[in-house]
């Protein structure tokens, strides 16, 4: 016999019956036949359906039928589903609160941002395996970013080059380098899950004919020698060093930024190129200049992305950054980045560091300008699928709507050429 739980006080009887089924009224017990009753006319015969229903009822064995309930399983399952959704939402809220706590700790220099970044990209790698990229709400933005990287990589990479990519992620650029016919690719990333996924992708790319070495390691916080020492097959110095959408993590401190650029310089041949994609500090300043000094945490964005600064120190310092390093904001990008701490890269600071470590500026342009200048010669090189993915609603190529600000305006491309080896100051002799 199915039992119904006790009705909560906040639930109406109608809701309760709808959720757990309505209790049928029990039928009166059959009266035993008596000798004097035999003369009474018999009742009308039951219909076949009524007989079937009665026959299916369970009996107590004493002539009394048990009551039974119409349990509405589908509604009960819906109730369980709602409960699971509530628990998932609660767990997600707790995770976001913990993450926000970590971000605040990073802003106050209590914890290193590397841990937050590593955990984020490990988690994103896990979720990325479970859905089709083509259904992403930012598929146009992803196509645009891929086109930018195709053009940038092709511009500075030559056949038989040895390539080092710092922050290689899940290996999304392996095919781009394959088109350049390089001889070796060395990819390093702080996320062990991203490296594992990059290895899986590489094994499925049977048409790549160059050597691929994938390493888990810290590209910015320590010497690259620590990460690459177990891999003697790496052919240093390299012809190309690339950093795509990750160098901003190095500008947490001056020490970290210097270590990152020193790693680049030491890994690169004289005449080789260092190129990449970074947030455009001028666009960020343009946005920050719109806020008054009373706004404690300046923020802006749209349905695709959002930027939130940890404080209003820029405004309070007469609309200038107090220091080139440690200017933190959290960045959210739909279906890609979940409020991860990033740091402003004042481009003149990057240029000065590169100059100090033996590299001269070759090119720096916002995404939109670089795309407009390079796209005419690329339309016949892109695959039909990518060309279709770049087409806007007006028939032109690029990004539009909310995606335009998040991609075309927020980022810039750069390239430096190494002109001399950096020689560290030798210790003074007594």
From Swiss-Prot:
The keyword Ribonucleoprotein does not apply. It catalyses: a 5'-end (5'-triphosphoguanosine)-ribonucleoside in mRNA + S-adenosyl-L-methionine = a 5'-end (N(7)-methyl 5'-triphosphoguanosine)-ribonucleoside in mRNA + S-adenosyl-L-homocysteine. It comes from the Eukaryota. One of its GO terms (cellular component) is P-TEFb-cap methyltransferase complex. Coiled coil: none annotated. Belongs to the class I-like SAM-binding methyltransferase superfamily. mRNA cap 0 methyltransferase family. This is mRNA cap guanine-N(7) methyltransferase. It comes from Eremothecium gossypii (strain ATCC 10895 / CBS 109.51 / FGSC 9923 / NRRL Y-1056).
């Amino acid at each position: 016999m199915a039992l119904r739980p006790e009705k909560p006080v906040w639930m109406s009887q109608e809701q309760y019956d709808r959720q757990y089924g309505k209790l049928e009224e029990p039928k009166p017990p059959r009266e035993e036949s008596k000798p004097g009753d035999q003369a009474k006319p018999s009742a009308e015969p039951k219909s076949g359906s009524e007989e079937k229903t009665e026959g299916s009822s369970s009996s107590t064995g004493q002539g009394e039928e048990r009551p039974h309930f119409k349990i509405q399983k589908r509604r009960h399952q819906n109730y369980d589903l709602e409960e699971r959704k509530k628990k998932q939402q609660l767990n997600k809220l707790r995770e976001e609160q913990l993450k926000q706590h970590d971000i605040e700790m990073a802003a106050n220099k209590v914890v290193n941002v590397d841990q937050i970044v590593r955990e984020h990209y490990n988690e994103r790698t896990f979720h990325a395996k479970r859905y089709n990229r083509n259904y992403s709400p930012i598929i146009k933005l992803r196509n645009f970013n891929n086109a930018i990287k195709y053009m940038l990589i092709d511009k500075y990479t030559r056949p038989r080059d040895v390539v080092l990519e710092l922050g290689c992620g899940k290996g999304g650029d392996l095919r781009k380098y394959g088109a350049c016919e390089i001889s070796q690719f060395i990819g390093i990333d702080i996320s062990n899950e991203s490296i594992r996924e990059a290895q899986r992708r590489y094994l499925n790319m049977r048409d790549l004919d160059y050597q691929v070495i994938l390493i888990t390691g810290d590209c910015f916080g320590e010497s690259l020698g620590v990460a690459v020492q177990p891999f003697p097959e790496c052919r240093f110095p390299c012809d190309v060093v690339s950093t795509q959408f990750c160098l901003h993590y190095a500008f947490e401190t001056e020490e970290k930024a210097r270590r990152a650029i020193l790693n680049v310089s030491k890994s690169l041949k004289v005449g080789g190129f260092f190129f990449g994609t970074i947030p455009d500090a001028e666009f960020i300043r343009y946005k920050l200049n719109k806020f008054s000094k009373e706004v404690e945490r300046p923020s802006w964005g749209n349905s695709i992305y959002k930027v939130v600064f940890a404080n209003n120190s820029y405004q309070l310092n007469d609309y200038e950054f107090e220091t080139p390093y440690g200017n933190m904001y959290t960045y959210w990008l739909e279906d890609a980045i979940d409020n991860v701490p990033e740091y402003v890269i004042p481009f003149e600071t990057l240029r000065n560091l590169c100059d100090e470590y033996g590299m001269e500026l070759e090119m720096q342009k916002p995404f939109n300008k670089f795309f407009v200048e390079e796209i005419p010669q690329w339309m016949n090189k892109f695959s039909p699928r990518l060309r279709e993915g770049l087409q806007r609603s007006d028939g032109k190529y690029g990004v539009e709507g909310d995606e335009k600000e998040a991609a075309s305006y927020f980022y810039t491309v750069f390239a430096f050429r190494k002109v001399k080896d950096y020689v560290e100051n030798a210790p003074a002799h007594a």
